[in-house]
């Protein structure tokens, strides 16, 4: 949301509480977060929200302007959104502490390898699709926002990665929106 430049009010709903689902259902018909309410429009799921914001704020640079670059970024964001289940199960998000030493099975290592391959491809072939910068498409974009939870997991669990992946993670972890997200955790 913040990347779009739109003003908004954030409603924080504590999770894992007896009334969490009831509270979430007030804003999201799927009972999942995040959700965006813009007047009479309700959008849930990260990808739906990003697409809505990209259409509403076309100059925000959420996606590349070139169709081929935009299609690649959307495909990778969708892969990130719906994939890497073994990694998500093995490496839970926890921005409050470090949890090194988790043993990685072949499925998790396969996810890590695929993510690094995506990041290498972005840095090699798509690095200036959204301007110049250290992020996947140059400037920080929706694609980096989609990978922020993975960056958080890799950071929390001190996953050994390639040099280019570490440099990318350092850039994401230093981005003001990521710093703000971590501080709010």
Identify the role of each PLM range:
Residues 184-185:
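Exported/periplasmic ABC-transporter solute-binding proteins
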Residues 82-174:
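GST-like fold's C-terminal all-alpha helical module
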Residues 2-103:
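GST-like domain detector, emphasizing the conserved glutathione-binding G-site
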Residues 1, 73, 144-145, 175:
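Short, thiol/selenol-centered motifs that function as redox-active sites or metal-ligating centers
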Residues 1, 54, 119, 123:
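Conserved hydrophobic residues forming the short capping helix/wall of the S-adenosyl-L-methionine
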């Amino acid at each position: 949301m913040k990347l779009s430049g739109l003003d908004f009010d954030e409603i924080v709903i504590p999770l894992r509480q007896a009334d969490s689902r009831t509270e979430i259902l007030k804003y999201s018909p799927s009972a999942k977060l995040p959700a965006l309410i813009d007047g009479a429009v309700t959008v849930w799921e990260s990808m739906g929200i990003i697409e809505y914001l990209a259409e509403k704020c076309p100059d925000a640079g959420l996606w590349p302007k070139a169709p081929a670059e935009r299609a690649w970024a959307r495909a990778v964001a969708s892969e990130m959104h719906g994939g890497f289940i073994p990694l998500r199960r093995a490496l839970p998000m926890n921005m409050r502490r470090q949890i090194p030493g988790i043993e990685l099975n072949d499925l998790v290592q396969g996810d890590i390898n695929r993510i690094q391959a995506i990041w290498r491809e972005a840095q090699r072939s798509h690095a200036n699709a959204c301007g110049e910068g250290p992020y996947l498409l140059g400037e920080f974009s929706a694609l980096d926002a989609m990978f922020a939870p993975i960056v958080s997991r890799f950071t929390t669990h001190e996953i050994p990665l390639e040099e280019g992946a570490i440099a990318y993670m350092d850039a994401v972890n230093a981005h003001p929106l990521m710093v703000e997200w971590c501080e709010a955790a």
